[in-house]
């Protein structure tokens, strides 16, 4: 039974990933049905950036740290339900992303699906989506009334701290 003494701090909480399904058909069909490109889906599945969970076959979008350890995960129902959220222990500074080195810019999205949709559009335009920094903010960012009181989203702060070459930030926010 949790007490004040044995509750771990946010930073100490381990990421609790759901059980991984041995198959990916449900997630693949869901993403393909949302218009995401076949090659992009396969890349994400092969790299375990996306997994299919059991028992509900949700799509789970995973973010990793520099040591390739999962530190963030968001789940989304693959049926008509609007069930979605972050897995327990998720650290938003490691949110879902497709990254390239030394591009000088980063593209920010509210969620993983928006990011994957943009990568698909880039491919349709003949651009190599692997050559861009595409990062999910892991939810909608809402600045304070006084902009000076606002904080930089943690995932962006961490990225800017780690990659000093970034000079341009492109926002892809739709507030849906």
Per-region residue spans from a language model:
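Phosphate-handling DNA/RNA-contact segment within nucleic-acid enzymes
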Residues: 54-162
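Conserved beta-strand termini and adjacent loop/short-helix elements that scaffold enzyme active sites
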Residues: 44, 137, 172-174
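Residue-level recognition of short, well-ordered coil/turn positions
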Residues: 31, 164-165
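Generic alpha-helical structural element
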Residues: 16-20, 107, 175
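Basic, glycine-enriched DNA-binding surface that flanks or lies within the catalytic cores of DNA
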Residues: 1-92, 97
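Acidic beta-strand-to-loop metal/phosphate-binding motif
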Residues: 108, 167-176
């Amino acid at each position: 039974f949790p007490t004040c003494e044995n509750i771990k701090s946010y930073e100490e909480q381990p990421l609790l990933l759901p059980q991984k399904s041995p198959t990916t058909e449900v997630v693949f069909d869901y993403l393909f049905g949302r218009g995401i490109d076949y090659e992009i889906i396969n890349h994400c599945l092969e790299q375990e950036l996306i997994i299919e969970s059991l028992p509900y076959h949700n799509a789970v979008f995973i973010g990793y740290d520099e040591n390739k350890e999962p530190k963030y995960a968001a789940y989304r129902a693959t049926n008509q339900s609007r069930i979605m959220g972050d897995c327990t222990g998720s650290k938003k500074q490691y949110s879902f992303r497709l990254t390239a080195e030394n591009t000088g810019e980063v593209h920010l999205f509210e969620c993983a699906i928006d990011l994957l949709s943009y990568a698909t559009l880039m491919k349709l335009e003949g651009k190599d989506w692997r050559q861009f920094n595409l990062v999910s903010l892991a939810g909608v960012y809402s600045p304070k009334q006084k902009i000076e009181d606002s904080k930089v989203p943690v995932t962006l702060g961490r990225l800017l701290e780690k990659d000093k070459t970034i000079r341009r930030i492109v926002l892809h926010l739709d507030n849906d």
